[in-house]
Regions:
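Helical scaffold of the NTase/Pol beta-like nucleotidyltransferase catalytic core
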Residues: 200-201, 231-258
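Catalytic or ion-translocation cores adjacent to nucleophile or general acid/base/metal-coordination motifs
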Residues: 241, 250-273, 279-340
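Active-site microenvironments that recognize anionic phosphate/pyrophosphate groups
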Residues: 1-228, 232-235, 309-311, 326-329, ...
């Protein structure tokens, strides 16, 4: 097939997915020609073109042609992503039209249908890259904290050497200032910054402030994984306003959860420079975890406080008035900010440097507003230079990155290297001399101590090796979350947690479960 025929197939795809109407066909065709620098197209009958392929399959021969004819620097992931956004941007209307359609659907059919359709639209225009996401490995593992969710992240492509070299030569720019800024809408992109011609955002008002209900994450980790960001490029900051905004969002989108990463290094997310939340239509393991005790907060009638059975230190607020819940959350946050407990290795400050903050997550529970406050501390010491309440050295062979919002809630995002390393570990465990095989293979040597302990407590065969390793990875993740918990899952740790709760109520609290 010629390039013109491939583009006609792409047009048919756009018509089938209702990205364009028949009256947009010629206009969109000319935009595609312009995007590819086609000046004298050969005539082709659109009526003879039929297509039943997936979008990635439709784009593949276009990439090949573009690389062969010099329209694309190289046929690699980096340059394919730049070209695909440019081509699919030809099918995307102006932002105001996307917003109008969203608001119309929301008014007629409700917010759940509006977000569902916007999610499908984001897939159809290849903003959400479903083919890449499908590469991720998912499984669940039962633990004492409930069933934890596990993911080996294989969806994000690595930059190829050619793109890395080109990035070094390219002039650095501060536009857009970060990957979240609203200026990304329609942005052409470069080897240093992803293209966003097929990207649209939906505005949302939170507590009388203009925020933006961003598109769904291009590499979603769970259903309808969305980002809600501040209109201006301002750093992450947890305050009473944070809790009010989260609860305000739930008033408009009650079918979603919404949460914020912490605002300090080590315990925060990967982007601290732009205030934002993450949400979606997923019931995380932490949301399913029950409160072991429920208390009355003396100064906040109508708001209950529960200690969640979870490896991290989580306080769960519930109430039917969002304003009261936000007040109680702010009380917890302000108390925690200045709280120190030497017995529990908790210090609020080193000099003037603050260490205590929170990761808040909100959801609706019927008519109730539920707000989980996860206590965080980013202090380091000689024994734990990356963080006292951070994955410890013993688990770094699996994961040493920060524990952000998604993992706090019980979904592990493990590095892609583990896919091959765990396959090699399974083979070594089933070999004639497992210990030697583990130590001599550079892919498994770092896992040898862990794998040897696995052999001591589990019977491992060729048939069950993969399953055993996945189960043990789940238990490592539970331990990682325990490391990140400020009050430990010991008698001393639980006693320390209750000392903090006594501070909240100004006098010993009353447990409603006793």
């Amino acid at each position: 097939m010629s390039i013109i025929e491939h583009l006609e197939q792409l047009l048919e795809y756009g018509l089938e997915r209702k990205l364009i109407s028949i009256w947009d066909r010629e206009y969109t065709r000319n935009r595609l020609y312009e995007a590819l620098g086609i000046i004298h197209p050969e005539p082709v009958s659109s009526t003879s073109i039929k297509q039943s392929q997936s979008l990635p399959d439709l784009l593949a021969p276009i990439y090949k042609w573009a690389a062969e004819t010099g329209r694309m620097e190289a046929d690699t992931d980096t340059y394919r992503d730049l070209l695909s956004a440019k081509l699919m941007g030809c099918f995307v209307p102006a932002p105001s039209e996307v917003i109008r359609k969203f608001e119309e659907t929301k008014a007629l059919y409700g917010p759940k249908q509006a977000t569902k359709e916007f999610y499908q639209y984001s897939e159809d225009v290849y903003y959400i890259r479903t083919d890449r996401i499908a590469k991720n490995v998912h499984w669940t593992v039962p633990t004492e904290y409930g069933e934890l969710e596990m993911t080996i992240n294989l969806s994000k492509p690595e930059k190829d050497p050619k793109a890395i070299a080109a990035a070094r030569e390219q002039e650095q720019t501060n536009y857009p200032m970060c990957l979240l800024c609203k200026e990304n809408v329609g942005f052409e992109g470069s080897v240093n910054h992803p293209a966003r011609q097929n990207h649209r955002i939906i505005p949302v008002i939170l507590e009388d402030e203009q925020w933006l209900f961003l598109q769904f994450s291009p590499y979603v980790y769970y259903p309808e994984h969305c980002i809600v960001l501040k209109g201006e490029h301002e750093p992450m900051e947890i305050s009473k306003k944070t809790f009010e905004r989260l609860l305000s969002f739930l008033g408009q989108y009650p079918h979603y959860f919404i949460g914020s990463n912490a605002d300090l290094p080590i315990v925060g997310g990967s982007i601290l420079s732009h205030d934002h939340f993450q949400g979606g239509a997923h019931d995380f393991p932490m949301a399913r975890a029950e409160a072991e005790d429920v208390y009355e907060l003396n100064d906040y009638p109508g708001v209950s406080l529960g200690l969640v059975k979870w490896p991290m230190s989580v306080l769960r607020l519930q109430g039917d008035e969002p304003g009261h819940v936000a007040e109680a959350a702010d009380h917890i946050f302000r108390t925690w900010q200045t709280y120190s407990d030497e017995k529990a290795s908790i210090a609020a400050y080193t000099g003037d440097t603050p260490h205590n903050t929170v990761t808040p997550i909100a959801r609706r529970r019927g008519d109730l507003y539920e707000l989980d406050i996860v206590l965080r501390n980013n202090r380091t010491n000689e024994e734990h230079p990356l963080g006292i309440f951070h994955p410890h050295q013993e688990v770094h062979h699996i994961k040493k990155e920060n524990i952000g919002l998604i993992e706090v809630m019980g979904l592990a995002i493990l590095p892609g290297r583990l896919q091959k390393e765990m396959k090699e570990t399974a083979a070594a465990l089933c070999s004639a001399d497992p210990k030697t095989a583990l130590e001599q293979n550079p892919l498994t040597a770092k896992h040898s101590e862990w794998a040897n302990r696995m052999m001591e407590k589990r019977t491992i065969t060729k048939e069950n090796a993969d399953l055993v390793i996945k189960e043990e990875l789940g238990h490592v993740f539970a331990r990682i979350l325990e490391h990140a918990g400020v009050f430990k899952q010991t008698a001393e740790g639980k006693q320390a947690f209750r000392r903090f709760i006594d501070q909240l109520a100004r006098k010993p609290v009353k447990s409603l479960n006793r």
